[in-house]
């Protein structure tokens, strides 16, 4: 990690009243956020941009205007210096208003403002409750209950327009019956948390409503993506300046890109002539790797039989000797080894494959090395933990999902490629209506032809904005904290009779895998009958957990092992007290099993 990482700015008003706001430095004043902080209780409101040319007096006046909200809940204002617009929250009868009454309808500005202010209030209330530990993680209902309708919440589509009042009810109920994945006690998935800066970025992204295929229609976002991808490649450790990459719809697609790039690198004729024109190719990945590698093998015409699984040790790491043996076996049988996937942070155990040893084997047999760091890539931001990915700089490609350990809102996944031009060559189709070569700007910034998609969502802005807000050091601290919580959990349960660890030793990542042993099974010798009973414990506790809605954690089997809990921590809001609560809740729900 570069030593030039900027330090977080310090505030001379650290002890100030949190309900008041002093002016921030000029670079922050560009955003309405300078006024948003004036009231904590009503929360943030999206208010547009403030022009950089505003005088200090003008900015002070705007902040004062926002402070009025503390004494009047009806005042919600947005002032842009170029038009002086000001909106007041008014009692509005939405039962007689419809979508056709909103902009671009004539005279639709006021109705639009009132409607959006109502939506923002719904969102802010949801955000506030998400961080309130007395709020449930979920209000669980079975599918048939939601399909049948819940207290006026009807999922069926209507032929005729419904009122904006009903639309607002639908907005509230959609959040009410969903899962609060940002709740500090939600541990069910690798992607958790609700970053406020990222949320602001996603709101702005949706408002801009553009596409990432050309600089022509997304100039700022395209440049942000290039700058961010370059920074990520540098953090991986690639010294060349001509690498490549793109943001994709998720880690599974990023992994698919890596296989496509490898195939095109060694057999470019496959693009025009198909798989019939190339030898019988095989791919290698660990038995603990993400299932997306096999999915990509099926989708790209290799076939799942030609995705060869490599044995792992008891910690879930690839055994290099088995990899080399299977490469030689495939060659002897007439297959052509093409690609090896090493995982940096497996989904279940959180294991890091020995990349250096795998890279040696790939170089020896001239194979493409991909590192799936979707889950573990965030550790590259930590000087304390990045050694776990030692050798990643030797990879030909890397998958890295900022929407996991870095807490970026879904979706945000990058495929990084060491060699420039492969993605373009592999996927380029030169659609004349998008990628005209005679545009008035440098068309090398039209990145859309590198993608297998045409339309591509803007995933970069929320990530870029978070990086600006936190700095590299902020992400480092966030990731270190999550790993410290995993260590805390492991130390708390490793020697207790109610719990049994799935594998020996401290976890490498935030994955802590364990069985809860109910009273009825403690001291019972291992046997098929005991394993069968133990297999049913985690699903029963999880069902009770979801019914109560107090917390969520995942479970699964692995190989011949009975169902166990897989605790993962990626939510910066989680604390030791939340870990304590989870353990107590598992004990409470499982004590009578």
From Swiss-Prot:
It catalyses: L-glutamate + H(+) = 4-aminobutanoate + CO2. Its cofactor is pyridoxal 5'-phosphate. Disruption phenotype: Deficient mice die at birth with cleft palate and apnea and exhibit reduced levels of glutamic acid decarboxylase and gamma-aminobutyric acid in the cerebral cortex. The modification N6-(pyridoxal phosphate)lysine is found at residue 404. The keyword NAD does not apply. Keywords: Decarboxylase, Lyase, Neurotransmitter biosynthesis, Phosphoprotein, Pyridoxal phosphate. One of its GO terms (biological process) is glutamate catabolic process. InterPro entries: PyrdxlP-dep_de-COase, PyrdxlP-dep_Trfase, PyrdxlP-dep_Trfase_major, Pyridoxal-P_BS. The modification Phosphoserine is found at residue 77. PROSITE patterns: DDC_GAD_HDC_YDC (PS00392). SUPFAM superfamilies: PLP-dependent transferases (SSF53383). Residues 1-22 are annotated as: Disordered. It comes from the Eukaryota. Homodimer. Belongs to the group II decarboxylase family. This is Glutamate decarboxylase 1.
């Amino acid at each position: 990690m570069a030593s030039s990482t900027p330090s977080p700015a310090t505030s001379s008003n650290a002890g100030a009243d949190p309900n008041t706001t002093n002016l921030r430095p000029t670079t922050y004043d560009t955003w309405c956020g300078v006024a948003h902080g004036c009231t904590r209780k009503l929360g943030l409101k999206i208010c547009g941009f403030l022009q950089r040319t505003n005088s200090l007096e003008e900015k002070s006046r705007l902040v004062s205007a926002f402070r009025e909200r503390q004494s009047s809940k009806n005042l919600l204002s947005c002032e842009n210096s170029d038009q002086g617009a000001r909106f007041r929250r008014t009692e509005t009868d939405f039962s007689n208003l419809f979508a056709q009454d909103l902009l671009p309808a004539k005279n639709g500005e006021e109705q639009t403002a009132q409607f959006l202010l109502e939506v923002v209030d719904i969102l802010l209330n949801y955000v506030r409750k998400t961080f309130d530990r007395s709020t449930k993680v979920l209000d669980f209902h079975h599918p048939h209950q939601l399909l049948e309708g819940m207290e006026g919440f009807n999922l069926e589509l209507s032929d005729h327009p419904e009122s904006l009042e009903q639309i607002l009810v639908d907005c509230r109920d959609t959040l009410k019956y969903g899962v609060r994945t940002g709740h500090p006690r939600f541990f069910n998935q690798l992607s958790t948390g609700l970053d406020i800066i990222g949320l602001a970025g996603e709101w702005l992204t949706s408002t801009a409503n553009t596409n990432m295929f050309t600089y022509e229609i997304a100039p700022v976002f395209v440049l942000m993506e290039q700058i961010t991808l370059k920074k990520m490649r540098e953090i991986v450790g690639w010294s060349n300046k001509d690498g490549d990459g793109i943001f994709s719809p998720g880690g599974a697609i990023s992994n698919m890109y890596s296989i496509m790039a490898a195939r095109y690198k060694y057999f470019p004729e496959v693009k025009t002539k198909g798989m019939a024109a190339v030898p019988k190719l095989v791919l290698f990945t660990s038995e603990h790797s993400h299932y997306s590698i096999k999915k990509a093998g099926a989708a790209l015409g290799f076939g799942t039989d030609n995705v060869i699984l490599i044995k792992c040790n008891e910690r879930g790491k690839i055994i290099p000797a088995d990899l080399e043996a299977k490469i030689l076996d495939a060659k002897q049988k007439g297959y052509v080894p093409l690609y090896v996937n090493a995982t940096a942070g497996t989904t279940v155990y959180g294991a890091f494959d020995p990349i250096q040893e795998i890279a040696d084997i790939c170089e020896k047999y001239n194979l493409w090395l991909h590192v799936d760091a979707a889950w573990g890539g965030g550790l590259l931001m930590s000087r304390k933990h990045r050694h776990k990915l030692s050798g990643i700089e030797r990879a030909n490609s890397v998958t890295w999902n900022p929407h996991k350990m870095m807490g970026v809102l879904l979706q945000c996944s990058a495929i990084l490629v060491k060699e420039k031009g492969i993605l373009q060559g592999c996927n380029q189709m030169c659609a004349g209506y998008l990628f005209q070569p005679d545009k008035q700007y440098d068309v090398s910034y039209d990145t859309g032809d590198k993608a297998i998609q045409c339309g591509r969502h803007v995933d970069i802005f929320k990530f870029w904005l978070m990086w600006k807000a936190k700095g590299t050091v902020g992400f480092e601290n966030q990731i270190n904290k999550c790993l410290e919580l995993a260590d805390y959990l492991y130390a708390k349960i490793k020697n207790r009779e109610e719990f049994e660890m799935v594998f020996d030793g401290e976890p490498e990542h935030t994955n802590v895998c364990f069985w809860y042993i109910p009273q009825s099974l403690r001291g019972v010798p291992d046997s098929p009958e005991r394993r069968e009973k133990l297999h049913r414990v985690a699903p029963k506790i999880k069902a009770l957990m979801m019914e109560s809605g107090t917390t969520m954690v995942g479970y699964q089997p692995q190989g011949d092992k009975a169902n166990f809990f897989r605790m993962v921590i990626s939510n910066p809001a989680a604390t030791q007290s939340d870990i304590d609560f989870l353990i107590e809740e598992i004990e409470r729900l499982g004590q009578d099993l």
